[in-house]
């Protein structure tokens, strides 16, 4: 099986593992973008942690789940959003105001939309989690 979109594959695997109650999930192949998105999930309290395992190829992430994710997924196509335009995408992808988080790639790195709004910067919405 080839991975056309590693972020989409990683998020669907995590979502499926959470829905059946697994405590861990392996995300392979690893990439910098997937690692940054997992860091946002960890910072926002949706996963217990993750570890990069080098297997001599692309590597993999071992993700420790905690049952806090109801749904997560990629946003395709990746929409550009200004610093004041996150509310429209919150309404579209999140079930309620201030519940869940959008993952945004900015010129300052990948972060949650709360951090981007606080910093006053825009970017592209790449994923959501709640």
Curated annotation (Swiss-Prot):
UniProt entry keywords in alphabetical sequence: Ribonucleoprotein, Ribosomal protein, RNA-binding, rRNA-binding
Keyword Ribosomal protein listed: yes
One Pfam family hit: Ribosomal_S8
GO MF term list: rRNA binding; structural constituent of ribosome
BP-aspect Gene Ontology terms: translation
Any one of the GO CC terms: ribonucleoprotein complex
InterPro entries (alphabetical): Ribosomal_uS8, Ribosomal_uS8_CS, Ribosomal_uS8_sf
HAMAP family in the record: Ribosomal_uS8_A
The family this protein is said to belong to: Belongs to the universal ribosomal protein uS8 family.
Protein function: One of the primary rRNA binding proteins, it binds directly to 16S rRNA central domain where it helps coordinate assembly of the platform of the 30S subunit.
Quaternary structure annotation from Swiss-Prot or TrEMBL: Part of the 30S ribosomal subunit.
UniProt protein name: Small ribosomal subunit protein uS8
